[in-house]
Design a protein with these regions (language model features):
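Gram-negative bacterial Sec-dependent N-terminal signal peptides
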Residues: 1-23
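Early extracytoplasmic/lumenal segment of secretory-pathway proteins
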Residues: 25-98
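Extracytoplasmic ligand-binding site segments that recognize negatively charged/polar headgroups
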Residues: 33, 39-43, 68-71, 91, ...
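Paired acidic/hydrophobic, glycine-rich loop segments that form the ligand-binding mouth/hinge
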Residues: 87-95, 236-237, 253-258
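A ligand-binding cleft/hinge motif common to bilobed small-molecule-binding domains
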Residues: 101-103, 256-273
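Periplasmic-binding protein-like
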Residues: 146, 224-228, 259, 271-292
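Mature extracytoplasmic/periplasmic domains
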Residues: 284-285, 289-356
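Conserved C-terminal helix/tail region of periplasmic/extracytoplasmic solute-binding proteins
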Residues: 349-382
Length: 382
């Protein structure tokens, strides 16, 4: 059906060198933002799988760089081609961060494809429809979800707090045994603070969707005052890794962490088996990476097939859950039958899929997020 096809996954070193592909071959360019482990995942795991299904396809893989900056390079490339009036664009599939995915939809850079792939119906979390206030329904498929949760030492805590209310009471009874990094040097602490505002200021649904109303922050005065009081009973950590280090050394017995980082450290023996996880009510934020298809891809069918494979239960189970300890982009129940019991229990026994769906929240949209961080600096840190 297809002529000899080459899929090139683009690099941070520059997207421009893909503009002059040889006319004799069909090139499907797939750009991936993210750190080196993301690039390696596409190169050493996804690419061979796709090549096995498409014998005439060759996959060459590099990335566009970590963080939103890597995603922004992809958006800049597509925006330039949009402005040039080109009939087709060089990129056919991209992996981008949540915020940039929303920005790309607003700029009209993406194709609506989710209803055209079989895995599109397997997505259940709201992040497939709302990207920090932008309606992205149909334009994105989550590659994975990262999530924050409360780690605790089960040797000393048999029943962890189930809510922010219970956590406040626990810290009053066990001063300095809970630790987090405030809003400095790591997003685990920022996530905890966002969850605090969801609990005591304005709920997550309102703060993670448009429209923005500057007046909403007037409702947070008590939340910030109570957080300042709460902080008198906690230990401040140096950052994401610092919280895990202090848990490992027994300097604290509870604190917010990234779930994937937690399990990776556990596998490496850097934290003891006695450390476990809980996701407290009314919830804490996490975020996805998205697979997207540019609006003027030359090869829409192959692009959809690539994303469909990447979001299939088998690939999500082996690649996303087992290799990286991420939560799957599709509904976890769709992945369960593809996982051995030990892997499922590791990732879902402590935080069940139901709890993840109920208490896994989005981060606030950018202006509310800024208001929360500025409010913390003004009313809590001082």
């Amino acid at each position: 059906m297809f002529a000899k096809t080459k899929i090139a996954v683009l690099a941070a070193v520059g997207l421009a060198h893909f503009t002059g592909a040889a006319q004799a071959e069909t090139v499907l360019n797939v750009a991936t933002a993210g750190s080196q482990n993301m690039v390696d995942y596409v190169k050493t795991y996804l690419a061979p799988k796709f090549e096995a299904m498409h014998p005439d396809v060759k996959v060459n893989v590099v990335g566009t760089g970590p963080g939103d900056a890597g995603s922004h390079k992809i958006m800049e490339k597509l925006s330039a081609q949009q402005q040039s009036g080109a009939e087709t664009w060089d990129l056919d599939v991209a992996v981008v961060h949540q915020k940039i995915g929303g920005d790309m939809v607003k700029q009209g850079l993406l194709a609506k494809y989710r209803s055209d792939i079989s895995t599109g119906k397997m997505v259940t979390r709201s992040t497939a429809e709302n990207a920090l206030g932008t309606d992205v329904n149909g334009y994105v498929m989550p590659m994975f979800h990262s999530q924050t949760a409360i780690a605790y030492n089960s040797d000393f805590i048999s029943t962890p707090p189930a809510s922010y209310d219970e956590l406040v009471k626990w810290t009053q009874e066990h001063p300095k045994a809970f630790g987090y990094n405030g809003i400095k040097n790591g997003m685990s602490g920022v996530s905890f603070v966002a969850g605090w505002i969801y609990a005591y200021g304005t709920d997550a649904e309102r703060l993670s969707s448009l429209p923005y109303d500057k007046g909403v922050e007037a409702n947070w005065a008590d939340a910030f005052a109570n957080l300042k009081s709460f902080n008198k009973n906690v230990t401040f950590t140096p950052g994401n890794a610092g919280t895990l280090d202090m848990l490992n050394r027994g300097e604290i017995f509870m604190g917010p962490v990234w779930v994937d980082m937690f399990y990776s450290w556990k596998e490496q023996g850097k934290i003891p088996p006695s450390l476990k996880l809980a996701l407290i009510a009314p919830g804490m934020p996490g975020q996805p990476m998205y697979y997207v298809a540019p609006k003027k891809t030359s090869h829409p069918e192959l692009a959809r097939e690539f994303i469909e494979l990447a979001t299939s239960p088998a690939i999500q189970a082996e690649g996303i859950v087992k290799r990286f300890n991420w939560y799957p982009g599709i509904d976890a129940e769709q992945v369960k039958s593809e996982l051995d019991e030990a892997t499922w229990n590791k990732l879902f026994a402590e935080i069940t899929p139901d709890e993840l769906a109920k208490f896994g929240k989005s981060f606030p949209i950018a202006p509310y997020f800024d208001d929360i961080k500025e409010g913390y600096e003004r009313h809590v840190a001082n």
